[in-house]
Amino acid sequence: MGGLFTGALLARNGYRVTVLEQNAAVGGGLQTFVRSGERFETGMHMLGGFRPGGSVRRICHYLGILDQLKIRPTDDDCMDSLHYLAEGERFAIPCGRERFAESFAARFPAEADGVRRYVEALYRLSDEVGMFRLREAQGSIFSHSEEFLLPADELIARYVADPRLRDILAYMNPMY
């Protein structure tokens, strides 16, 4: 979510907004490009947060655009598929906080507690950003916990020891 969403949120809150786009079409990171005759889709393939209570759903409702969207649900058992080439393994990533944690706990039983605590940490950290919950900022918007400020690899290492699982979670960190 980028400039258009930000502009819409500012406008919804009474600001006069002008959104500028440097490319020929609006969409920021959702553009495609062609190199050597091959077309590359660079945009997202899936967007979470649209289930009831989800942060993106609440934001779209707040902006008054939810009813205009054509949302197709993802497969509950495999919202995404990760291929870990170093080991030749495939990981089907299920929908939902608990199922996400359970799926990795099943594949990495020695890390079950760490995975659950890591997922809880991600949700705790997202709670520090008032925008995700559509609430007013409390105190300075630039004041966050020590854990919030950690690089992703250090945060993951606090909870997970297995290097393979740390690789997988680090890859997925910006997405989930």
Language-model segments: residues:
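Rossmann-like flavin
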Residues: 86-176
